[in-house]
Amino acid sequence: KSRARNYAIVKAVAILGTLLVPLLRATLMQNVSERWHVVYLVPAIVGFVMSLFALLFAKETNAFLTKRIEYLKTPIEEREQRSKEGREQNAQGGILIAVKFAFKHRQLRFLIIACCCFYLASLGTATYSTVMAKSALMTEEEITLALFLYPVGNALFTLISGFVSDKFGRKVTIVAMSCSALTCYLLFIFSGMFKWTPYLTGFAIGGFMGSYWGAGDTIGGIMFSESSPTNLRSSVTVINTLLNGVMGGLATVITMILLPIIPESMFGYMYLGMTVPGLVGAIVIMWLFVGETRGLDLKTVTGTEWDKPKKVKEEQQDGE
């Protein structure tokens, strides 16, 4: 019931840990760009130590322990039967079969199209430092000030996405957070390029990141799986991963062609020109053509729930 909210809370708290980066920029690095490696070395060491601490002292969840105990109490014959059924289900899967199935059914087909648009905007998540330094011509001190507000915006919008998902459903979350990402990225570009204030610039790009990945986690990690039958669920979710890589690669190729042509001062507008159409396309497709999946029983999902009645009837007749 509150899985998305709890996940968002944990993620938001973790994001606030990145406040260490601007703090180290202002102290150890002292806003001298040649010392950047010192900034990232310390968080890496701290992260390693904390991970080791968690590995040694974190306890298993009650859900896992209950499931494990239930499995150990199951007779060996029944375990073997379950394993056999699992292998038979996996044998029905495969990426090629999943792709064919996805394009054949309305929900998954439009999810793929929406993801193609959505991931075209992914360059915005990796190029904000370039925009601030090269296009907005912000000083190292201004970038440090912006980075103090970046985790705050990121954590806040990550938290919002979790509460929206549990309260209003997957589709509303994706549309709302995509709109939020679009607004925040526009604000980031204009705040940086027109020298409004580094604090607003940092908060805006943080809001974009939190909104973008809040929508991305929902569309890729949840809706694909909730729109697929059990025997194809794992294979269908791989499609999302492939789309992320393909569209991200395509966006990178486009920028590699454009970067030598346009001046550095225009980089921000170039990334804006790729981010806005991608997010707008994803919003329109999700709103008009994709159905809600919240509350579905994953054991009974067939993938045909969103097809037109005539098509479903034809498939049932073919199956008979």
Labelled PLM ranges:
Residues 4-30, 46-47, 240-252:
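Glycine-rich segments within core transmembrane alpha-helices of 12-TM secondary carriers
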Residues 1, 215-228:
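Intracellular juxtamembrane helix-capping segments at the cytosolic ends
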Residues 179-195:
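C-terminal ends and interior cores of transmembrane alpha-helices
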Residues 70-109, 309:
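Juxtamembrane intracellular "pre-TM" segments in multi-pass secondary transporters
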Residues 167-178:
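Cytoplasmic membrane-interface "Motif A"-like loop-to-helix N-cap segments
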Residues 37-56, 269-287:
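Symmetry-related core transmembrane helices of the 12-TM Major Facilitator Superfamily/SLC fold
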Residues 21, 105-155, 248-252:
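Extracytoplasmic gate region of multi-pass secondary transporters
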Residues 198-215:
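Hydrophobic core of transmembrane alpha-helices in multi-pass small-molecule transporters
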